[in-house]
Amino acid sequence: MNTNFVVNEYALVWYLLFQASISEPIYKIKQRLWDAFKDKYNNMFNDKLLILEDYKNFIPNDDTIYNIFFESKEYQKIRKQVEKYRLEVMRIWDKNKKVTQKLYSNIIREKVDEFTFFVVSKELNIIDNPIKEKAIIGIEIDKKDTTEYLLRLNMVLVMNSIKKYNEEDNDFKNDIVELAILNEYASNLNDRSCYLNGTPSLMELKRWIYPYWLMYLGIPKDELLSRMMRDKIAFELDNYAYEKELVKMNLEEFIDFCIRNKRYIIREQKVTKQEINKFQQMDEVPEEII
């Protein structure tokens, strides 16, 4: 997997111009440029996709505003900060390369040949993925715990690699990608279960998918109970036939399987929400769930 982290000056200026101002000096530069070159400023809006599609060869139709921005002291200061930030991002990525490679070989089961992250100021607080295989990253890094940052990078990568689904089925895609990144991958990074993390509105769907997800991961039938205990997600084992073919699928195929079989997966379960809440705080599995 070839993942690149680059600073492209045109992309950096574009996001500084068209996102919320990150400082008073930047706001003043933008206001001055708007007052002096309103038409040119408006025309630059369409440059974003052109820059990202062919960033190595991009030449603006009109470079007036870009050049003024490049020459400003405030931009030079930000440019140095962004390069320092880029090196920090690369250090986090490289440090976790082995466990990330396992994510793609064992969990996603799909190669990401090449992906480019355009690094911008973290003061912009942005993750943007406007075109395939390219994304903008500019968010704070928690120095004490870089795991969250790594998870967000990989959410972008995996979401980008999977086809689009219709609105009705999109929750299945989002939920299963969360299972892969925010739950299984995060558990591997932290050496503890992270299966209660994720979008609250998707938790009920996640509980329905979870037994099949364990089969997809290749967890043996006689270990399902211990995984249920570890992850604190209750389901009735006797209600599920063990689907041996799931372990042969990649993530996108598993999403398709769940969508095709959703009327069987989303079933009435005897385990109530009250029992689940109680179960999540227990150290032993109650017999009625076994």
Region spans (language model):
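Auxiliary, metal-adjacent structural segments of Zn-dependent hydrolase domains
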Residues: K73-A135, D191-Y195
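Short, charged/polar micro-motifs that form catalytic or ligand-binding hotspots
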Residues: R86-D94, K143-K144, D171-D175
